[in-house]
Amino acid sequence: MILEANIEIVHRLYQTGKGSFKEMLFQLMALYEAVYTPVRIVVFGAPQNNEEYCERFSQIRNVIAERFGNTAPTVSYVAQPPCPQGLVMEVHEVVLTDADRICYKTLDDVPYITVEREGCKRLFMSGIIGNVLQATIRRQADDVFRTISHIMIAEQMPVSSIVRQWNYIEKITDCDVTGHQHYQDFNDARSLFYQSAQWLDGYPAATGIGTQWGGVMIDIDALFCQDKTVCVKAVDNPLQVSAHAYSQNVLLGEKDEKLNKKTTPKFERAK
């Protein structure tokens, strides 16, 4: 829960009918007119395999870059077919004030956006992926978290400033030939990434979303307010066991060799 009016995020949804991928993509661009400042565009579609996923993700990035130029929002492509068939686009806009300064940056060939005012900084990352075509889910997760770490270090923001995290995982409940479940491998990579941070205000609010293709992809919102003008609180559900308190009995697959046991999903229900 964020108790500050000027960090509002507005969500907008658009959908096309069925057509060629290029036609649907241009239809989405024609439908969208920004009201505030877009910081993230997420496109949901149905590629047939990872090769097509990578090709289409590149097309999406190029079209959005042409549309927005140097002020392009961050971009994600989720391989999950909308119903009915077509493309769906979700846009996140931020409501800026006169005190806010927005910057469009790139590190390790990854575009990201910061919104900063005196004493407070926000960070938006989207579409952070690894080697979708060749690497294992675990290797991809490690690479994605390494990229996130590089950006957060460059921006002087602690890992604990992540407030919202979308985790997209290909065939999330599948196991590989060694018995490692995709989701458990991701959770172990996340636990190792989080272990250096102090989570005094709880873990990020997050969701693990299974996809048909696309390996591991992460979107992140981070918020770091040194002036304490923004209060961030974890929201729990007393009717549920917190995900980070799950027992070993509900965790599937083999444990990581770097760990003594399988690690729990590190997230809060909301924040």
Language-model regions: role of each:
Residues 1-166, 171-271:
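N-terminal presequence-like segments and the immediate start of the first folded domain
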